[in-house]
Curated annotation (Swiss-Prot):
Role: Could be a positive regulator of bsdBCD expression in response to salicylic acid.
Ranges of residues in domain HTH lysR-type: 1-59
Gene3D superfamilies recorded: 3.40.190.290, Winged helix-like DNA-binding domain superfamily/Winged helix DNA-binding domain (1.10.10.10)
Name listed for the protein in its UniProt record: HTH-type transcriptional regulator BsdA
DNA-binding region (UniProt annotation): 18-37
Length: 290
């Protein structure tokens, strides 16, 4: 048994079909079938139920072996990375993610680390907190910046400074507004609100606060995409209530941010990372920036 056979087995378990696994592994189907048979013969157990026509499902023994095979493969990959990183130069790939509200904060750090280590490549995700946690635990990303803390035995958090939300307007829209605004005055503006798929986040906070104050907001658009929302705001389509960290650096000269008096919209971001495996040097350098 070797690492290559473990990779084959894990891929078959993920794809649930020999043909799909062979295609993903860039090899022919017969050699892959032989490798699986050799592995089963060596272990003395059947790893897959082959009686089902559409897909191969793991037997009980196969499910137990899959868990251990993944652990072994991850440890092997960690060892390879750690040895390779004994070189002084920081290189490789930095895989990180963030929620839509922390995107600008994350990208600011990514830009800093890119300037410091020009040989790095990047894999960047934007998603919901629960999905980011899954990506961390499945080792698809090394770190994430989020506004919602989800408990996990394999992930550690570092809370960052509070982030206030602000009213964001286009400089060219001509809305009469100073540097501060009261909540009771916000309904006079056409609002574009970001509404995540799961319905949580700033959207719920804003709607609950308007309801508490018996105010009727003038909502002209509910947007499910952060890039589209920012484009609409900068074009003068309407105003929005957003965390300041969500506004990209290149846009800050083209929009006007207005502080909300007695601000009820405060977010506490955190950076999170895995604790049950080796943390690649690029990820360590990324976390050091927070």
């Amino acid at each position: 048994m070797d690492i290559r056979q473990l990779r084959y087995f894990i891929t078959i378990a993920q794809e649930q079909k020999i043909t799909s696994a062979a295609k993903k592994l860039h090899m022919a189907q017969p050699p892959l079938s032989r490798q699986l048979k050799q592995l089963e013969d060596e272990l003395g157990v059947v790893l897959f139920d082959r009686n089902k026509k559409k897909q191969m499902t793991l037997t009980y023994e196969g499910a137990v072996f899959l868990k251990r095979a993944k652990e072994i493969l991850h440890r092997f990959e960690d060892a390879v990375i750690e040895v390779q990183e004994l070189k002084e130069e920081v290189a490789g790939t930095l895989a990180v993610g963030s929620t839509i509200y922390c995107a600008a904060l994350m990208l600011e750090k990514v830009t800093q680390i890119k300037e410091r280590y020009p040989h790095l490549t990047f894999n960047i995700w934007e998603n919901e907190p629960a999905t980011l946690l899954e990506l961390l635990e499945s080792r698809q990303i090394d770190a994430a910046v989020t506004t919602t803390l989800i408990k996990s035995d394999t992930v550690q958090f570092k809370q960052l400074d509070d982030i206030p939300c602000v009213l964001v307007l286009s400089d060219e829209a001509g809305y009469p507004c100073g540097d501060t605004i009261k909540m009771v005055d916000i309904p006079s503006f056409p609002l574009i609100l970001l509404r995540p798929v799961n319905g949580k986040g700033v959207y719920n906070q804003v709607m609950n606060e308007f309801h508490r104050l018996n105010l009727e907001p003038r909502i002209v658009c509910e947007c499910h995409d952060s890039a589209t929302l920012l484009s609409l705001v900068s074009s003068g389509f309407g105003a929005s209530i957003l965390p300041v960290t969500m506004i990209p650096v290149h846009m800050r000269n083209h929009v006007h941010t207005v502080h909300i008096e007695n601000n009820p919209f405060i977010m506490t971001p955190a950076v999170m990372w895995r604790t049950d495996s080796y943390l690649p040097k690029p990820a360590q350098q990324f976390l050091d920036l927070f």
